[in-house]
Amino acid sequence: MNIAKQQQAFLGIDYGKKRIGLAFASSPLLIPLPIGNVEARSSLTLTAQALVSIIKERAVTTVVFGNPLPMQKAYASSVQSEIQELAALIQEMTAIEVILWDERLSSAQAERMLKSDCGLNRKQRKNSSDSLAATLILSSFLDSRKLY
């Protein structure tokens, strides 16, 4: 069975301790678009519940978390372990596919794009960079899978 022919909906997530950027793509076009940010909650369980409501609302079939792999293998961040825990919680709550995707430097790339290409001020960039980073993460994932 060709997986690209099935109805698919992807949620890209750029996790941050304060804000979580979101992007969405669905078949047949699978074009990732930023859909905004959600505020991180006081616990990972509450954050997972907030994300699960978006997952259900948009009938998401696959969640793609940006996984900030360290540039040096010996270093692992606390954010990385939070992402792994949050991904596991979402998978338990929804039983859908949750993928951790290498997102090294996606936030920096998003910030550069917004600064140079859009002419946004610092506050505007701050509000847009997380969802743009999620869009870059989801785009990278979809490109690698050639799902379009």
From Swiss-Prot:
<comment type="similarity">
    <text>Belongs to the YqgF nuclease family.</text>
</comment>
<dbReference type="GO" id="GO:0004518">
    <property type="term" value="F:nuclease activity"/>
</dbReference>
<dbReference type="InterPro" id="IPR037027">
    <property type="entry name" value="YqgF/RNaseH-like_dom_sf"/>
</dbReference>
<keyword id="KW-0963">Cytoplasm</keyword>
<keyword id="KW-0378">Hydrolase</keyword>
<dbReference type="Pfam" id="PF03652">
    <property type="entry name" value="RuvX"/>
</dbReference>
<protein>
    <recommendedName>
        <fullName>Putative pre-16S rRNA nuclease</fullName>
        <ecNumber>3.1.-.-</ecNumber>
    </recommendedName>
</protein>
<keyword id="KW-0540">Nuclease</keyword>
<dbReference type="InterPro" id="IPR012337">
    <property type="entry name" value="RNaseH-like_sf"/>
</dbReference>
<keyword id="KW-0690">Ribosome biogenesis</keyword>
<dbReference type="InterPro" id="IPR006641">
    <property type="entry name" value="YqgF/RNaseH-like_dom"/>
</dbReference>
<comment type="function">
    <text>Could be a nuclease involved in processing of the 5'-end of pre-16S rRNA.</text>
</comment>
<dbReference type="GO" id="GO:0005829">
    <property type="term" value="C:cytosol"/>
</dbReference>
<dbReference type="GO" id="GO:0000967">
    <property type="term" value="P:rRNA 5'-end processing"/>
</dbReference>
<dbReference type="InterPro" id="IPR005227">
    <property type="entry name" value="YqgF"/>
</dbReference>
